[in-house]
Structure formats: C-alpha cells, structure tokens
C-alpha cells in the first residue's frame, strides 16, 4: 500500500516556507501567532 507522506524538500518549502507565509496576509498572521507563542521555529 502506498504511504501517504513522501517527503520532498522543495515541496515542503514551497508550501510551508517562510517566504510563502510572508506572501499573504493570513500567512503573516500565522507567523505572528507563532512568534507570540514563542516558537523557536516559525516555518518549515
């Protein structure tokens, strides 16, 4: 049976990366929340 998670570095960055988050208003809100929460890693 096919495993559902087949990691790709490029896809991970493109979908969940910092620049992707910064490119939309809601993405910036995600970063803001994670900063507020005190996450050491903001994005993938």
UniProtKB/Swiss-Prot annotation:
The keyword Ribonucleoprotein applies. GO terms for biological process: translation. Residues 1-44 are annotated as: Disordered. Gene3D superfamilies: 1.10.287.3980. Pfam families: Ribosomal_L34. One of its GO terms (cellular component) is ribonucleoprotein complex. Keywords: Ribonucleoprotein, Ribosomal protein. Residues 1-23, 30-44 have a biased composition (Basic residues). InterPro entries: Ribosomal_bL34. Belongs to the bacterial ribosomal protein bL34 family. This is Large ribosomal subunit protein bL34. The gene is rpmH.
């Amino acid at each position: 049976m096919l495993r559902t998670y087949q990691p790709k570095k490029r896809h991970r960055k493109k979908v969940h990366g910092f620049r992707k988050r910064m490119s939309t208003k809601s993405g910036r809100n995600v970063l803001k929340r994670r900063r507020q929460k005190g996450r050491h890693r903001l994005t993938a």
